Protein backbone atom coordinates (compact mmCIF):
# COMPACT_ATOMS: atom_id res chain seq x y z
CA UNK A 1 0.00 0.00 0.00
CA UNK A 2 1.39 3.43 -0.98
CA UNK A 3 2.12 5.74 1.93
CA UNK A 4 0.01 8.88 2.12
CA UNK A 5 1.72 12.13 1.16
CA UNK A 6 2.49 14.15 4.28
CA UNK A 7 1.16 17.71 4.28
CA UNK A 8 1.93 20.53 6.71
CA UNK A 9 -0.61 23.35 6.49
CA UNK A 10 0.13 26.95 7.52
CA UNK A 11 -2.78 29.39 7.75
CA UNK A 12 -4.74 31.53 10.17
CA UNK A 13 -8.08 33.20 9.21
CA UNK A 14 -11.43 31.86 8.03
CA UNK A 15 -10.32 31.80 4.39
CA UNK A 16 -7.55 29.36 5.34
CA UNK A 17 -9.89 27.32 7.55
CA UNK A 18 -12.19 26.66 4.59
CA UNK A 19 -9.19 25.53 2.54
CA UNK A 20 -8.01 23.23 5.34
CA UNK A 21 -11.47 21.70 5.67
CA UNK A 22 -11.48 20.96 1.93
CA UNK A 23 -7.93 19.56 2.09
CA UNK A 24 -8.92 17.14 4.84
CA UNK A 25 -11.38 15.47 2.45
CA UNK A 26 -8.50 14.34 0.20
CA UNK A 27 -6.23 11.29 0.40
CA UNK A 28 -3.21 13.12 1.85
CA UNK A 29 -2.28 13.08 5.55
CA UNK A 30 -2.26 16.52 7.21
CA UNK A 31 0.41 15.84 9.83
CA UNK A 32 0.64 19.29 11.36
CA UNK A 33 -0.78 22.81 11.26
CA UNK A 34 1.08 26.05 11.83
CA UNK A 35 -1.05 29.07 12.76
CA UNK A 36 -0.63 32.42 14.47
CA UNK A 37 -0.55 32.53 18.28
CA UNK A 38 -3.86 33.14 20.06
CA UNK A 39 -4.63 36.88 20.10
CA UNK A 40 -6.87 39.07 22.30
CA UNK A 41 -10.21 39.70 20.60
CA UNK A 42 -13.63 41.14 21.35
CA UNK A 43 -14.62 43.68 23.97
CA UNK A 44 -13.28 41.51 26.77
CA UNK A 45 -9.92 41.18 24.97
CA UNK A 46 -9.85 37.48 25.81
CA UNK A 47 -7.40 35.24 23.98
CA UNK A 48 -8.99 33.69 20.91
CA UNK A 49 -7.75 30.78 18.82
CA UNK A 50 -7.59 31.30 15.07
CA UNK A 51 -10.23 29.62 12.86
CA UNK A 52 -7.50 27.32 11.50
CA UNK A 53 -6.48 26.25 15.00
CA UNK A 54 -10.08 25.46 15.88
CA UNK A 55 -10.51 23.38 12.70
CA UNK A 56 -7.25 21.50 13.31
CA UNK A 57 -7.96 20.71 16.96
CA UNK A 58 -11.45 19.46 16.09
CA UNK A 59 -9.82 17.11 13.56
CA UNK A 60 -7.12 15.94 15.97
CA UNK A 61 -4.28 17.51 13.95
CA UNK A 62 -1.24 18.72 15.94
CA UNK A 63 -1.10 22.54 16.10
CA UNK A 64 2.04 24.69 16.35
CA UNK A 65 2.01 28.44 17.00
CA UNK A 66 5.52 29.91 16.83
CA UNK A 67 5.78 33.68 17.29
CA UNK A 68 8.29 33.61 14.44
CA UNK A 69 9.20 31.04 11.81
CA UNK A 70 12.63 32.60 11.35
CA UNK A 71 14.11 30.66 14.26
CA UNK A 72 16.05 27.42 14.29
CA UNK A 73 13.37 25.94 16.55
CA UNK A 74 10.65 26.50 13.93
CA UNK A 75 12.81 24.91 11.26
CA UNK A 76 13.51 21.84 13.41
CA UNK A 77 9.83 21.59 14.30
CA UNK A 78 8.93 21.45 10.61
CA UNK A 79 11.75 18.98 9.94
CA UNK A 80 10.39 16.66 12.64
CA UNK A 81 7.10 16.43 10.73
CA UNK A 82 8.90 15.17 7.59
CA UNK A 83 6.53 16.91 5.17
CA UNK A 84 6.30 16.14 1.48
CA UNK A 85 4.65 19.52 0.93
CA UNK A 86 3.95 22.75 2.82
CA UNK A 87 0.67 24.48 1.93
CA UNK A 88 0.40 28.13 2.98
CA UNK A 89 -2.87 30.09 3.01
CA UNK A 90 -2.99 33.55 4.62
CA UNK A 91 -0.61 32.48 7.37
CA UNK A 92 0.39 35.99 8.42
CA UNK A 93 4.17 35.56 8.46
CA UNK A 94 6.80 35.81 5.76
CA UNK A 95 8.46 32.39 5.67
CA UNK A 96 12.25 32.15 5.22
CA UNK A 97 13.77 30.21 2.35
CA UNK A 98 15.02 27.50 4.73
CA UNK A 99 11.40 26.70 5.67
CA UNK A 100 10.16 26.79 2.07
CA UNK A 101 12.92 24.48 0.86
CA UNK A 102 12.59 21.84 3.57
CA UNK A 103 9.61 19.78 2.29
CA UNK A 104 10.57 17.35 -0.46
CA UNK A 105 8.10 19.02 -2.86
CA UNK A 106 8.66 22.54 -1.57
CA UNK A 107 5.84 24.91 -0.63
CA UNK A 108 2.76 26.21 -2.42
CA UNK A 109 0.48 29.13 -1.60
CA UNK A 110 -3.22 29.71 -2.22
CA UNK A 111 -3.73 33.43 -2.87
CA UNK A 112 -7.04 35.26 -3.34
CA UNK A 113 -6.20 37.20 -6.49
CA UNK A 114 -5.24 36.71 -10.11
CA UNK A 115 -1.50 37.07 -9.67
CA UNK A 116 0.51 39.12 -10.38
CA UNK A 117 -2.38 41.48 -9.55
CA UNK A 118 -2.88 42.28 -5.88
CA UNK A 119 0.07 40.65 -4.20
CA UNK A 120 -0.04 41.13 -0.45
CA UNK A 121 -2.33 41.19 2.55
CA UNK A 122 -5.70 42.52 1.32
CA UNK A 123 -6.32 41.34 -2.26
CA UNK A 124 -10.09 40.93 -1.93
CA UNK A 125 -10.82 44.42 -0.60
CA UNK A 126 -8.37 46.07 -2.99
CA UNK A 127 -9.94 44.40 -6.01
CA UNK A 128 -13.41 45.65 -5.05
CA UNK A 129 -12.18 49.15 -4.20
CA UNK A 130 -10.40 49.40 -7.55
CA UNK A 131 -13.55 48.46 -9.45
CA UNK A 132 -12.12 45.22 -10.86
CA UNK A 133 -14.67 43.20 -12.84
CA UNK A 134 -13.20 39.82 -11.93
CA UNK A 135 -11.15 38.15 -9.25
CA UNK A 136 -10.04 34.62 -8.60
CA UNK A 137 -7.57 32.32 -6.92
CA UNK A 138 -3.97 31.71 -7.89
CA UNK A 139 -1.92 28.82 -6.52
CA UNK A 140 1.80 29.41 -6.80
CA UNK A 141 5.10 27.78 -6.00
CA UNK A 142 6.51 29.74 -3.08
CA UNK A 143 9.83 31.56 -3.07
CA UNK A 144 11.37 34.13 -0.75
CA UNK A 145 9.64 37.15 -2.38
CA UNK A 146 6.13 38.37 -1.51
CA UNK A 147 3.65 36.34 -3.60
CA UNK A 148 6.17 36.34 -6.44
CA UNK A 149 6.54 32.64 -7.31
CA UNK A 150 5.46 30.99 -10.56
CA UNK A 151 1.73 30.31 -10.88
CA UNK A 152 0.68 26.65 -10.93
CA UNK A 153 -3.08 27.07 -11.27
CA UNK A 154 -5.59 29.88 -11.67
CA UNK A 155 -9.37 29.99 -11.32
CA UNK A 156 -11.41 33.10 -12.20
CA UNK A 157 -14.80 34.39 -11.13
CA UNK A 158 -16.68 37.64 -11.78
CA UNK A 159 -17.03 40.30 -9.08
CA UNK A 160 -20.75 41.06 -8.76
CA UNK A 161 -21.97 44.65 -8.57
CA UNK A 162 -23.17 44.04 -5.00
CA UNK A 163 -20.22 41.95 -3.79
CA UNK A 164 -18.77 42.95 -0.44
CA UNK A 165 -15.38 41.80 0.79
CA UNK A 166 -17.30 39.29 2.93
CA UNK A 167 -19.32 37.75 0.09
CA UNK A 168 -16.40 37.66 -2.33
CA UNK A 169 -14.19 36.18 0.41
CA UNK A 170 -16.56 33.25 0.89
CA UNK A 171 -16.81 32.50 -2.83
CA UNK A 172 -13.05 32.69 -3.30
CA UNK A 173 -12.41 30.48 -0.27
CA UNK A 174 -14.61 27.72 -1.69
CA UNK A 175 -12.98 28.17 -5.10
CA UNK A 176 -9.51 27.97 -3.52
CA UNK A 177 -10.22 24.64 -1.87
CA UNK A 178 -11.39 23.13 -5.15
CA UNK A 179 -8.44 24.57 -7.09
CA UNK A 180 -6.04 23.15 -4.52
CA UNK A 181 -7.41 19.66 -5.16
CA UNK A 182 -6.59 20.00 -8.87
CA UNK A 183 -3.07 21.21 -8.07
CA UNK A 184 -2.34 18.38 -5.65
CA UNK A 185 -3.54 15.73 -8.08
CA UNK A 186 -1.34 17.20 -10.83
CA UNK A 187 1.59 17.72 -8.46
CA UNK A 188 1.74 14.06 -7.42
CA UNK A 189 1.38 13.04 -11.08
CA UNK A 190 4.07 15.56 -12.10
CA UNK A 191 1.78 17.26 -14.61
CA UNK A 192 2.17 20.86 -13.37
CA UNK A 193 3.64 23.53 -15.64
CA UNK A 194 4.65 26.61 -13.60
CA UNK A 195 4.12 29.97 -15.34
CA UNK A 196 6.39 32.86 -14.22
CA UNK A 197 4.60 36.06 -13.18
CA UNK A 198 4.98 39.10 -15.45
CA UNK A 199 6.78 41.81 -13.40
CA UNK A 200 5.16 44.53 -15.53
CA UNK A 201 1.68 43.54 -14.30
CA UNK A 202 2.40 43.50 -10.55
CA UNK A 203 0.12 45.47 -8.22
CA UNK A 204 0.15 45.40 -4.42
CA UNK A 205 -2.73 44.91 -2.00
CA UNK A 206 -1.44 46.72 1.06
CA UNK A 207 -2.96 45.93 4.46
CA UNK A 208 -6.14 47.88 5.19
CA UNK A 209 -5.86 50.78 7.61
CA UNK A 210 -8.79 52.07 9.64
CA UNK A 211 -8.19 55.65 8.52
CA UNK A 212 -8.73 54.59 4.89
CA UNK A 213 -12.33 53.73 5.75
CA UNK A 214 -13.20 57.33 6.68
CA UNK A 215 -15.39 58.45 3.78
CA UNK A 216 -14.14 61.52 1.93
CA UNK A 217 -17.29 63.01 0.43
CA UNK A 218 -15.24 64.94 -2.14
CA UNK A 219 -14.70 61.65 -3.99
CA UNK A 220 -17.17 60.42 -6.64
CA UNK A 221 -20.17 58.50 -5.29
CA UNK A 222 -19.17 55.44 -7.35
CA UNK A 223 -15.76 55.36 -5.64
CA UNK A 224 -17.33 55.68 -2.19
CA UNK A 225 -19.88 52.94 -2.91
CA UNK A 226 -17.04 50.58 -3.82
CA UNK A 227 -15.21 51.50 -0.61
CA UNK A 228 -18.32 50.72 1.44
CA UNK A 229 -18.38 47.23 -0.08
CA UNK A 230 -14.60 46.76 0.10
CA UNK A 231 -14.47 47.62 3.82
CA UNK A 232 -17.38 45.34 4.77
CA UNK A 233 -16.93 43.51 7.14
CA UNK A 234 -13.74 45.28 8.26
CA UNK A 235 -12.67 47.99 8.97
CA UNK A 236 -16.15 49.29 7.90
CA UNK A 237 -16.63 52.58 6.05
CA UNK A 238 -17.57 55.39 8.41
CA UNK A 239 -18.30 59.09 8.71
CA UNK A 240 -19.52 61.53 11.37
CA UNK A 241 -23.15 62.46 12.02
CA UNK A 242 -23.78 65.17 14.60
CA UNK A 243 -20.18 64.73 15.80
CA UNK A 244 -20.59 61.01 16.49
CA UNK A 245 -19.38 58.03 14.49
CA UNK A 246 -21.67 56.55 11.87
CA UNK A 247 -20.71 53.32 10.13
CA UNK A 248 -21.96 52.79 6.59
CA UNK A 249 -22.65 49.15 5.72
CA UNK A 250 -24.53 49.51 2.46
CA UNK A 251 -25.04 52.32 -0.04
CA UNK A 252 -26.03 52.98 -3.63
CA UNK A 253 -25.14 55.60 -6.20
CA UNK A 254 -27.74 58.14 -7.29
CA UNK A 255 -27.39 60.75 -9.98
CA UNK A 256 -26.47 64.37 -9.36
CA UNK A 257 -29.01 66.68 -7.74
CA UNK A 258 -28.76 70.20 -6.36
CA UNK A 259 -25.61 72.19 -5.73
CA UNK A 260 -24.84 71.32 -2.10
CA UNK A 261 -21.28 70.96 -0.86
CA UNK A 262 -19.86 67.40 -0.63
CA UNK A 263 -21.01 65.73 2.59
CA UNK A 264 -24.30 67.62 2.72
CA UNK A 265 -27.58 65.74 3.01
CA UNK A 266 -29.41 66.63 -0.18
CA UNK A 267 -32.55 64.57 0.45
CA UNK A 268 -34.18 62.30 3.01
CA UNK A 269 -36.02 59.56 1.12
CA UNK A 270 -37.90 56.46 2.27
CA UNK A 271 -34.83 54.23 1.74
CA UNK A 272 -32.43 56.55 3.56
CA UNK A 273 -30.56 59.84 3.46
CA UNK A 274 -28.91 60.98 0.24
CA UNK A 275 -25.49 62.62 0.53
CA UNK A 276 -23.86 64.89 -2.03
CA UNK A 277 -20.44 63.69 -3.22
CA UNK A 278 -17.72 65.15 -5.42
CA UNK A 279 -19.61 63.56 -8.30
CA UNK A 280 -23.21 62.30 -8.08
CA UNK A 281 -24.81 61.36 -4.75
CA UNK A 282 -24.75 58.38 -2.36
CA UNK A 283 -27.78 56.96 -0.59
CA UNK A 284 -27.05 55.28 2.74
CA UNK A 285 -29.09 52.06 2.87
CA UNK A 286 -27.70 50.49 6.07
CA UNK A 287 -25.90 52.41 8.81
CA UNK A 288 -24.78 51.93 12.39
CA UNK A 289 -24.74 54.87 14.81
CA UNK A 290 -22.04 54.81 17.50
CA UNK A 291 -22.88 52.29 20.22
CA UNK A 292 -25.98 51.03 18.42
CA UNK A 293 -26.94 48.17 16.14
CA UNK A 294 -27.19 48.27 12.37
CA UNK A 295 -30.24 50.17 11.07
CA UNK A 296 -31.83 50.25 7.65
CA UNK A 297 -31.61 53.61 5.96
CA UNK A 298 -35.34 54.13 6.46
CA UNK A 299 -35.20 53.29 10.20
CA UNK A 300 -32.26 55.65 10.63
CA UNK A 301 -34.18 58.45 8.89
CA UNK A 302 -37.24 57.88 11.10
CA UNK A 303 -35.34 57.52 14.35
CA UNK A 304 -32.72 60.25 14.00
CA UNK A 305 -34.63 62.67 11.75
CA UNK A 306 -31.65 63.92 9.72
CA UNK A 307 -32.36 67.21 7.96
CA UNK A 308 -31.58 68.37 4.44
CA UNK A 309 -28.51 70.58 4.65
CA UNK A 310 -26.91 68.76 7.58
CA UNK A 311 -23.30 67.83 6.87
CA UNK A 312 -21.68 64.43 7.42
CA UNK A 313 -17.99 64.13 8.21
Curated annotation (Swiss-Prot):
GO cellular component labels: cytosol
GO molecular function, one term: methionyl-tRNA formyltransferase activity
Record field: catalytic activity: L-methionyl-tRNA(fMet) + (6R)-10-formyltetrahydrofolate = N-formyl-L-methionyl-tRNA(fMet) + (6S)-5,6,7,8-tetrahydrofolate + H(+)
Enzyme class per UniProt: transferase
InterPro entries, per the entry: Fmt, Formyl_trans_C, Formyl_trans_C_sf, Formyl_transf_N, Formyl_transf_N_sf, Formyl_transferase-like_C_sf, Met-tRNA-FMT_C, Met-tRNA-FMT_N
Positions annotated to bind (6S)-5,6,7,8-tetrahydrofolate: 113-116
Annotated SUPFAM superfamilies: FMT C-terminal domain-like, Formyltransferase
Domain of life according to the entry: Bacteria
Keywords in alphabetical order: Protein biosynthesis, Transferase
The UniProt record lists the keyword Transferase: yes
The enzyme's E.C. designation: 2.1.2.9
Family under the similarity heading: Belongs to the Fmt family.
Function of the protein: Attaches a formyl group to the free amino group of methionyl-tRNA(fMet). The formyl group appears to play a dual role in the initiator identity of N-formylmethionyl-tRNA by promoting its recognition by IF2 and preventing the misappropriation of this tRNA by the elongation apparatus.
Protein name: Methionyl-tRNA formyltransferase
Amino acid sequence: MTEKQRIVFAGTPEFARITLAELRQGPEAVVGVFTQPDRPAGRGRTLQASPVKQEALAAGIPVFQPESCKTGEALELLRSLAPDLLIVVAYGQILPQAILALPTRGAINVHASLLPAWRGAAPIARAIAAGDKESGVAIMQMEAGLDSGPVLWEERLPIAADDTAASLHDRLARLGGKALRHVLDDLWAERLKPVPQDPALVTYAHKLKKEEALLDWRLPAATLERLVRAFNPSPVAHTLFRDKGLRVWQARVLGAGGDQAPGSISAVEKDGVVVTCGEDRLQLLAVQPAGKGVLSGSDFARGYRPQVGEVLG
